[in-house]
Amino acid sequence: MIILYLFRLSLLCAVALLSVTVRAGSSPVLILEHAADRLELASWLDILPATTPPESSEQLLAQPDTLPWRALDQSVLAQGYRSEGLWLRPKIQNFGLVQRRILELNRSNLGHIEVITRRSNGSWQTRTAGTAELSPQGDINGLGYSFEVVIPEGMSTIYFQLKSSYPLTTPIHLSTENALLRASQNSAAVYGVGIGLLGGI
């Protein structure tokens, strides 16, 4: 009787420890508020280990929650050389009405970007960009890339994959249109100052 009781107690403790471990393994859910016009997403990003990447986006979307996602645990995405591709996701909770936001990926050294978001009809939309893409979406001015995303009411998830031929240190923001415009103007101003200093030298 005592052995059975101890067995049940140890089993209960193991289940509790496992649940704590699972919760600790993922990043917290981003609570989207209208007042937050520009958010650095790194603190809310989950990442797939390089040892278990899905073979395609179709495989990812088939069973997304069964994959071994873990918290990024970085203040900004800094992953070094990642030519094989890196899958990331933020989980977002929107308690208000539908919001339109801009997903910003800074830096010009992103060879391939794939952004996957859910449409209002339940299907998935996939968009690509990057310097390696045969399209006019290459980062001409070095200011990065931006994708409009619709954040529905309730819980939602954005998936994206990044590939880079250089060390991957890429700020990722979720912004309003006005915040994106201000950030672009600031970046362009800094770029212009750099060119001016170079010309003066």
Indicate residue ranges for each PLM-predicted region.
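Bacterial N-terminal signal peptides that target proteins for export
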Residues: 1-10
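Hydrophobic helical h-region of N-terminal Sec-dependent signal peptides
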Residues: 11-12, 16
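N-terminal signal peptide c-region/cleavage motif recognized by signal peptidases
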Residues: 19-21
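Soluble non-transmembrane domains of integral membrane proteins
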Residues: 25-187
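Core alpha-helical transmembrane segments of integral membrane proteins
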Residues: 183-201
